[in-house]
């Protein structure tokens, strides 16, 4: 699962 906050984080 990837979430977009500051940058792409797995």
UniProtKB/Swiss-Prot annotation:
Organs and tissues of expression: Synthesized in the neurosecretory cells of the brain, and transported to the storage lobe of the corpora cardiaca.
User: Which residues are modified to Pyrrolidone carboxylic acid?
Assistant: 1
Q: Which Gene Ontology cellular-component terms appear in the entry?
A: extracellular region
Which residues get modified to Proline amide? Answer: 10
Q: Which family does it belong to?
A: Belongs to the AKH/HRTH/RPCH family.
State a single Gene Ontology molecular function: hormone activity
Which UniProt keyword terms apply here?
Answer: Amidation, Hormone, Neuropeptide, Pyrrolidone carboxylic acid, Secreted
Q: Where in the cell is it found?
A: Secreted
> Which InterPro entries does this chain map to?
Adipokinetic_hormone_CS
Q: What does this protein do?
A: The in vivo function of this peptide is unknown. Has no adipokinetic or hypertrehalosaemic activity in locusts. Has hypertrehalosaemic activity in the cockcroach P.americana.
What's an example GO BP annotation here? neuropeptide signaling pathway
Protein name as it appears in the record: Hypertrehalosaemic hormone
